[in-house]
Amino acid sequence: MEWNGLKMIISTMEPQVSNGPTSNTSNGPSSNSRNCPSPMQTGAATDDSKTNLIVNYLPQNMTQEEFRSLFGSIGEIESCKLVRDKITGTQFEEHFKDLATGTKWKPLTEEGPIFGKGQSLGYGFVNYIDPKDAEKAINTLNGLRLQTKTIKVSYARPSSASIRDANLYVSGLPKTMTQKELEQLFSQYGRIITSRILVDQVTGVSRGVGFIRFDKRIEAEEAIKGLNGQKPSGAAEPITVKFANNPSQKTSQALLSQLYQSPNRRYPGPLHHQAQRFRLDNLLNMAYGVKRFSPITIDGMTSLVGMNIPGHTGTGWCIFVYNLSPDSDESVLWQLFGPFGAVNNVKVIRDFNTNKCKGFGFVTMTNYDEAAMAIASLNGYRLGDRVLQVSFKTNKTHKS
């Protein structure tokens, strides 16, 4: 990756007014993601959270030096860390809570976090000396296009009960409703962090299902009170607005078992795909919500404690993709799974002698709900002359 002259480019760059592309196929945050206001404006941030930033959707091949160079062009940095796969070189879990709650980085000693040369997980943290530089970094770099990614820069919010479980699931939306109209409908109840309308990956037509994440749970509660059972403009039926379920709930585990485990087949392949897709969509509509704010939030991590669901690893949810063509490479997997949410890493398994794809690969996604939705949408998807088989990775899945 070439970064020469980057500082000069950044210094002349106009502040970004959008957090990402408007296309539904972009590999990065959706365009509805808000520019995070200054903590001085909201009055809700602590002193520490005025300088700590989380950066999502970074190119996988971006180095620590490039990451520091990019954000160092804004102002003096106290610490800057690109998070890497702990299995391939990084140990950060013991120190994660210090970062997420806005406290200062621990020194890089033998007892501190080791940021080695493992595979990048696509996100990192920056802690500035001056809060004004942190604010400038958000205004300048949020929405910046790097390779195929559009990065998202926001304050690393402290863990608090008031900001947990603020995700809403909305169904029964008019098929003609746009993302902007969805936001306009809900914005009267509070600050929207992210929103999303699910579309059919083949036709591009809305599925009538959307997700809204508010800044605070109380705002989400007010939206449920005000809009659940109401008919928005253009709707033939009342919409349903409810909290997106936590994947650790028993109902979700039971539904997941129905979705992805079959006594007769090793993989949930494309047979009777249209009927299966209808069943998958209905089950997912009952159980799952998409979390789009951050790849690592305290509530997101604690919700995974004690779970025993196929595909869960220490770095996210591993998805097995089968029946890829010999010419497939990692970019194919990025393009397929990127629109569904935060992708930590992708890997195409290649033949040692020919370096051609052996027909399968793996994708690790940060959020369970996004991974489940990607599987439901892409299992049975026709890619060229092949029909993909997509499922959560299990112990019986092909070894890499």
Swiss-Prot record:
Q: Does the keyword Transferase apply?
A: no
Comp. bias regions, Low complexity: 18-33
Where is this protein localized, as stated in its record? Cytoplasm; Perikaryon; Cell projection, Axon; Cell projection, Dendrite
Q: Where is composition skewed (Polar residues) in this entry? A: 34-44
Cite the PROSITE patterns for this sequence: RRM (PS50102)
Tell me which InterPro entries the record gives.
ELAD_HU_SF, HuD_RRM3, Hud_Sxl_RNA, Nucleotide-bd_a/b_plait_sf, RBD_domain_sf, RRM_dom
Ordered alphabetically, the record's keywords are: Cell projection, Cytoplasm, Developmental protein, Repeat, Ribonucleoprotein, RNA-binding
GO molecular-function term, one example from the UniProt record: RNA binding
List the record's Gene Ontology CC terms alphabetically: cytoplasm; dendrite; growth cone; perikaryon; ribonucleoprotein complex
| Matching Pfam families | RRM_1 (PF00076)
SMART domains named among the record's database cross-references: RRM
Main location per UniProt?
cytoplasm
Region (Disordered) location: 12-48
Matching CDD domains: RRM2_HuD, RRM3_HuD
Domain named RRM: which ranges? 51-158, 166-246, 317-395
Is Metal-binding set as a keyword in this record?
no
Q: Which family does it belong to?
A: Belongs to the RRM elav family.
Query: Which NCBIfam families does the record associate with it?
Result: ELAV_HUD_SF (TIGR01661)
Q: What does this protein do?
A: RNA-binding protein that is involved in the post-transcriptional regulation of mRNAs. Plays a role in the regulation of mRNA stability, alternative splicing and translation. Binds to AU-rich element (ARE) sequences in the 3' untranslated region (3'UTR) of target mRNAs. Mainly plays a role in neuron-specific RNA processing.
In its UniProt entry, what is this protein called?
ELAV-like protein 4
